[in-house]
Amino acid sequence: MTIALGKSSKEEKTLFDTVDDWLRRDRFVFVGWSGLLLFPCAYFALGGWFTGTTFVTSWYTHGLASSYLEGCNFLTAAVSTPANSLAHSLLLLWGPEAQGDLTRWCQLGGLWTFVALHGAFGLIGFMLRQFELARSVQLRPYNAIAFSAPIAVFVSVFLIYPLGQSGWFFAPSFGVAAIFRFILFFQGFHNWTLNPFHMMGVAGVLGAALLCAIHGATVENTLFEDGDGANTFRAFNPTQAEETYSMVTANRFWSQIFGVAFSNKRWLHFFMLFVPVTGLWMSAIGVVGLALNLRAYDFVSQEIRAAEDPESETFYTKNILLNEGIRAWMAAQDQPHENLIFPEEVLPRGNAL
């Protein structure tokens, strides 16, 4: 009898293998390597937002009340941007501005940079989570690719735009009314609705909503092997193994309606992916342009001419009036640090005068 001596063919597990096994174990909530980025960042971003909207004032940065503690509601509460004088400082708690004083840090707007940066990395972590899970179960990574679109919008609006301006002050604050204020600001100072990149973004988002509605209704309309119930919802069985709607019937229906229709499910679903993702990416590119002050005023030469020469006989369009009104109102209200006071003759007159 021969006895073979030597090392076992099974190699010893390294620390990396042990951690990898634990992180990627099949459990109710998948963790994964991406979770090391996602979970802490999401926790801190949400925690910072709830803390700021509940307790922290914006009196020192914007001259506003912005917390539930001060009487705001869900619509008016916000985590506000730092003052313009702080420019692009990261406002670290231990930095030269706050010097480790938590109260001072909150008063200076440190929670905004805290929420913005942790939020950005949290979103990136969520996209990486989709990549990681797709790789684990051998799916293609289109979910993660699609999620890159809202990440692009978040990063362009909350980080790249204020980096192109004079400071974080000009980014949106994290709140409902604050976001609407930012939209008004974009219109008045950048003529955003006339920007072709914004137009592509609107077409993408509204087009995607239309495609979703059409697709869902068409699948419901062409079910052929349903339950016995008279009602669609009682008849629907979520555990049925096979597909029970007719692509051929759907194709025939839309061919009659529009004259053209998708004949291939892959092309149909790719189009539903392509429309919103491309739209959001285009709008993100447009916001990067605005960060560099590449405004859409060039598309309304009347507005340029009216601004340069008050005596010029231009068509004083409602678009010009809207933007001038927004600027005259917001510049003084929204940028109190500038101490702007406009004389009567430069304010928009309206149609009556």
Swiss-Prot record:
Q: Which GO terms describe its cellular component?
A: chloroplast thylakoid membrane; photosystem II
- Write down which residues bear the modification named Phosphothreonine: T2
Q: Which residues bind Fe cation?
A: H215, H269
Q: EC number(s) on record?
A: 1.10.3.9
Indicate the transmembrane segments per the record.
Answer: 41-61, 125-141, 153-166, 208-228, 279-295
Q: Where does a plastoquinone bind?
A: H215, F262
Task: Supply the alphabetized keyword list.
Answer: Acetylation, Chlorophyll, Chloroplast, Chromophore, Electron transport, Iron, Magnesium, Membrane, Metal-binding, Oxidoreductase, Phosphoprotein, Photosynthesis, Photosystem II, Plastid, Thylakoid, Transmembrane, Transmembrane helix, Transport
Identify the residues that bind pheophytin a: Q130, N143
The free-text cofactor remark is: The D1/D2 heterodimer binds P680, chlorophylls that are the primary electron donor of PSII, and subsequent electron acceptors. It shares a non-heme iron and each subunit binds pheophytin, quinone, additional chlorophylls, carotenoids and lipids. There is also a Cl(-1) ion associated with D1 and D2, which is required for oxygen evolution. The PSII complex binds additional chlorophylls, carotenoids and specific lipids.
Q: Which InterPro entries match?
A: D1/D2, Photo_II_D1/D2_sf, Photo_RC_L/M, Photo_RC_L/M_CS, PSII_PsbD/D2
Q: Which residues bind chlorophyll a PD2?
A: H198
Tell me, in one coarse class, where this protein mainly resides: plastid
Cellular compartments annotated:
Plastid, Chloroplast thylakoid membrane
Q: Which domain of life is it from?
A: Eukaryota
Q: Name one GO molecular function term.
A: iron ion binding
A Pfam family it matches: Photo_RC
* Reaction(s) catalysed (UniProt annotation): 2 a plastoquinone + 4 hnu + 2 H2O = 2 a plastoquinol + O2
Q: Which residues are annotated as modified residue N-acetylthreonine in the UniProt record?
A: T2
GO BP field:
photosynthetic electron transport in photosystem II
Q: Which residues bind chlorophyll a ChlzD2?
A: H118
Function as written in the Swiss-Prot or TrEMBL entry: Photosystem II (PSII) is a light-driven water:plastoquinone oxidoreductase that uses light energy to abstract electrons from H(2)O, generating O(2) and a proton gradient subsequently used for ATP formation. It consists of a core antenna complex that captures photons, and an electron transfer chain that converts photonic excitation into a charge separation. The D1/D2 (PsbA/PsbD) reaction center heterodimer binds P680, the primary electron donor of PSII as well as several subsequent electron acceptors. D2 is needed for assembly of a stable PSII complex.
Family classification: Belongs to the reaction center PufL/M/PsbA/D family.
The protein here is known as Photosystem II D2 protein
Q: Which organism is it from?
A: Pinus thunbergii
* Gene name, Swiss-Prot/TrEMBL: psbD
